[in-house]
Amino acid sequence: MITYDLKGKTALVTGGASGIGFATATVLAKAGAAVAINHLADDPRGPEAVAKLHAMTGARVISAPGNVGDAADGPRMVEQAVADLGRLDYLVNNAGTPATRTTIAPHELDRLTEEVWHTLLQVNLLGVFRCAKAAAPALRAARGAVVSTASIAGINHAGSSMAYGATKAGVISLTKNLARGLSPEVRVNAVAPGAVDSTWMIEWTNEQRASSIDNALLKRRCTPEDIAEVIVFLLAGAAMVTGQTIVVDGGLTT
């Protein structure tokens, strides 16, 4: 893994209490950055993650409770995190949801309710826009960077539902347009993970678990750390990369 010296830098990681978010926060903190971990206000994993990461790294780690899927709470959370950190160099839009615990196949249209669509759009797509918009002044001042978590479901893979895939395709499109809108001061990119070992796989069938390995060229699933490595590269390195989505799936979609 490439290492960076991020002393004096700050980062806000949404959905940072577990999985890809916590792995990314860990890499940033180990490199010396001060990190704000966003989590839902009633999620006990948030304060636990903050305490754990501070103990692991000695870095400044703060809690940033709030719901990115809420039109008022999301921007409020970002503004408070920026105020607490004093500046903002990096925004990681990682918070997301599948909205359902089980896969909704393309032919199961009746299961794709308005409620499912609303939840997915509010969190996965509008949440990304809200956070980027709220963070834009601070990011411009710092000449910072944004990385959002998309998915191979937004490109050419089934994902948990067609609605989930549509929101992730939206993140990919939004990434290009935010890169235009925030240039030249801020770089904006995305990662599109494939199958990742995480709590999202709890409801997967044995067949789904096996196929996610068998169909990948590298014959393993991604770990949260695999994705975090690319996210931090896009934040702290990759000085001439913007508006791009990097697929990290071990060759699953190749």
Annotate each PLM feature.
Residues 10, 17-19:
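Conserved glycine-rich cofactor-binding loop
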Residues 33-48:
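Conserved glycine-rich Rossmann-like NAD(P)H-binding loop of the short-chain dehydrogenase/reductase
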Residues 43-44, 65-78, 114, 225-226:
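The beta1-alpha1 cofactor-binding region of Rossmann-like NAD(H)/NADP(H)-dependent oxidoreductases
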Residues 89, 110-129, 147, 171, ...:
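Catalytic Tyr-X3-Lys loop
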Residues 102-118, 201, 212:
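Substrate-binding pocket helix/loop in short-chain dehydrogenase/reductase
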Residues 132, 138-140, 183, 220-248, ...:
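C-terminal substrate-recognition "lid" of short-chain dehydrogenase/reductases
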Residues 132, 167, 175:
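Active-site helix of classical SDR
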Residues 151:
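Residue(s) in the substrate-gating loop at a strand-loop-helix junction
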